[in-house]
Amino acid sequence: MKKTIEVSDIEKKYKNPVAQLVETACGYSSHIGLECDGKNINAKSLMGVMAFGLKKGMIVNISTEGDDCELALEGISEFLSA
């Protein structure tokens, strides 16, 4: 499954958004990928998410694949855009 979202101001919402995003992603069994400007990362990789440099206003493509892909897609999109 895929969805495109605009990243909200996650720095203001979460104390440590990178670690919290990875923790959220690790709560799902599905593979979760993030893509922006030609960069593709695994959302369960702390180093990958740090290098990705999520910022407010970024347009990110989220892709999920696996048993709980619908829940994972909704959870990650809500985390990044709510």
Which residues are covered by each model-predicted region?
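Compact, glycine-rich, soluble single-domain proteins
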Residues: 6-42, 47, 51-52
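C-terminal structural segments of small proteins and small subunits
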Residues: 6, 29, 51-82
